[in-house]
Amino acid sequence: MSNGIVAKRYAVALFKIAKEKHVLEMFEEELRLVQNVYVKNGELHSFLTQPNISKEQKKTFLANVFGSVSESILNTLYILIDNKRIDILPEIADEYVVLANEERNVADATVYSTRLLSEEEKLNIAEAFAKRTGKDAIRVKNVVDEDLLGGIKVRIGNRIYDGSLQGKLARIQRELMKNR
C-alpha cells in the first residue's frame, strides 16, 4: 500500500478524534509543530528511523521532545514507531490539514510576490480569493520569489492564479501567435 494512502488513513483517524473532541484547530497546530521539528531536524529523523534503537527508547525520546502535545498526537507517534511508519509523519500532517480545512471551509494559499506583502495586502488577497473560491476564509502564506518581475502568483491547492508580469506577457505572446 502506498505511503499516501496509509498517511490518509492515519489523518482520517486523527481527524475523527479531533472532531469528536472539538479540537480540530489544536490538533492541526500540534501536527504542524511535530511535522516542522521532524522535517527540519535531520538528527531526529535519523534517530527515529534507526533500526538498532529500540522502539521503547524512541517512544521515551518522543515523550521528552513532544511531551506538551495532546495524548492523541503522542499516541499516534507511538503507533507510527510500532508500525515502522514514522517516515510518513509529514504526509499525515498535510492530509490532516486538508481534512480540517475542508471541514471549516477554509483554504491555504501560497502567494508568491516580489517583496513581502503587508498584512493589509494579505487580507485583501484573502478576501478576494475567498469570494472567488467560495471559501469562508483563505489563510495566506507569503513567499518572496525574486524571479518574478512584478505582480503575484497565488497557489490554492493544486490551482495557480497567475497575476504576474511574466504570466501576462506569456498570455499576450500566445494571443499574438494565435492571431498570426
Curated annotation (Swiss-Prot):
Family the UniProt entry places it in: Belongs to the ATPase delta chain family.
InterPro entries given for it?
Answer: ATP_synth_OSCP/delta_N_sf, ATPase_OSCP/d_CS, ATPase_OSCP/dsu
**Any single GO CC term annotated in Swiss-Prot or TrEMBL for this entry:** proton-transporting ATP synthase complex
Q: Name one GO molecular function term.
A: proton-transporting ATP synthase activity, rotational mechanism
Superkingdom of the source species: Bacteria
| Keywords from the named record | ATP synthesis, Cell membrane, CF(1), Hydrogen ion transport, Ion transport, Membrane, Transport
Species name: Bacillus cereus (strain ATCC 14579 / DSM 31 / CCUG 7414 / JCM 2152 / NBRC 15305 / NCIMB 9373 / NCTC 2599 / NRRL B-3711)
What the entry lists under PROSITE patterns is as follows:
ATPASE_DELTA
**Which named protein is this?**
ATP synthase subunit delta
Kindly report the protein's main subcellular placement as a broad class.
membrane
Query: What is said about its interaction partners and assembly?
Result: F-type ATPases have 2 components, F(1) - the catalytic core - and F(0) - the membrane proton channel. F(1) has five subunits: alpha(3), beta(3), gamma(1), delta(1), epsilon(1). F(0) has three main subunits: a(1), b(2) and c(10-14). The alpha and beta chains form an alternating ring which encloses part of the gamma chain. F(1) is attached to F(0) by a central stalk formed by the gamma and epsilon chains, while a peripheral stalk is formed by the delta and b chains.
Q: Does the keyword Lipid biosynthesis apply?
A: no
Its function, per the record, reads: F(1)F(0) ATP synthase produces ATP from ADP in the presence of a proton or sodium gradient. F-type ATPases consist of two structural domains, F(1) containing the extramembraneous catalytic core and F(0) containing the membrane proton channel, linked together by a central stalk and a peripheral stalk. During catalysis, ATP synthesis in the catalytic domain of F(1) is coupled via a rotary mechanism of the central stalk subunits to proton translocation.
Transmembrane segments annotated in the record for this chain: none
Q: Name one GO biological process term.
A: proton motive force-driven ATP synthesis
Intracellular or extracellular location(s): Cell membrane
How does the UniProt record describe the way this protein sits in the membrane?
Answer: Peripheral membrane protein
